[in-house]
């Protein structure tokens, strides 16, 4: 779907541009100014961002097979982390086509990105504190992953975007038939019908 592909490429370009403009060409960068941590000024601190030494495992949803991959891949690569992409089985062929184009471009070092279209097997058992798991999908699967013994025991950083329940709020001062009301109805209709409403903003 054009929204999926164009949105994914657009998101990736925004992240890459932000990295090019705002981050140094280095393995670490200083985030913010020196801050006083004690009343006397004897203790000060400053955030220094460095990449984790592990891998980013991205378990993605079915409804945006390209966008989901690219929007997670871009910041991970920018942070210096290799990526393992695990797309949803239902749409993994679409993800694989886009992935093969990335590999064929030879823009990334060999092994910087990998794709698993089947079962993860025992991959999660081998992750540690320098690794990251990012999941998009159902609340039930998110709960299952979040409570995986190896992720807990090894303090693996886990992020989840799960079943979205979104509200659409229209101000009480908006009158039926006004341009604002008509736009609101049009946008709500679009959100619940595009991709059968199966997207995070529906």
Q: What are these model-predicted stretches?
A:
Residues 1-41, 88:
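N-terminal Rossmann-like NAD(P)+-binding subdomain of aldehyde/semialdehyde dehydrogenases
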Residues 12, 95-98, 126-127, 145:
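Hydrophobic packing residues within well-ordered alpha-helices of enzyme cores
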Residues 36-99:
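Substrate-binding/gating loop at the entrance of the active-site cleft, primarily
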Residues 43-46, 113-134:
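A structured beta-alpha segment of the ubiquitous adenosine-cofactor-binding alpha/beta core
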Residues 54-55, 109-113:
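Short acidic capping loops at alpha-helix termini that bridge into adjacent secondary structure
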Residues 56, 63, 117-124, 137-142:
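Beta-loop-alpha module in the N-terminal Rossmann-like domain of NAD(P)-dependent dehydrogenases
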Residues 104-106, 129-132, 140-202:
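ALDH superfamily catalytic-core signature
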């Amino acid at each position: 779907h054009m929204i999926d592909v164009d949105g994914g490429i657009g998101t990736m370009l925004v992240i890459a541009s932000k990295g090019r403009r705002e981050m140094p060409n280095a393995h670490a960068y200083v985030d913010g100014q020196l801050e006083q941590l004690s009343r006397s000024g004897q203790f000060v601190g400053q955030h220094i961002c460095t990449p984790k030494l592990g891998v980013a495992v991205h378990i993605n949803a079915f409804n945006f097979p390209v966008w989901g991959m690219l929007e997670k891949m871009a910041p991970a690569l920018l942070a210096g982390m290799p990526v393992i992409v695990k797309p949803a089985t239902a749409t993994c062929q679409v993800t694989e086509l886009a992935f093969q184009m990335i590999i064929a471009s030879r823009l990334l070092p060999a092994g910087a990105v990998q794709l698993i279209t089947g079962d993860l097997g025992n991959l999660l058992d081998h992750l540690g504190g320098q690794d990251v798991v990012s999941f998009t999908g159902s609340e039930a699967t998110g709960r299952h992953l979040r409570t995986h013994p190896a992720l807990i025991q090894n303090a693996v950083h886990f992020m989840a975007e799960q079943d979205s329940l979104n509200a659409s709020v229209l101000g009480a001062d908006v009158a039926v038939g006004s341009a604002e009301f008509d736009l609101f109805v049009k946008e709500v209709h679009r959100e619940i019908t595009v991709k059968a409403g199966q997207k995070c903003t529906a």
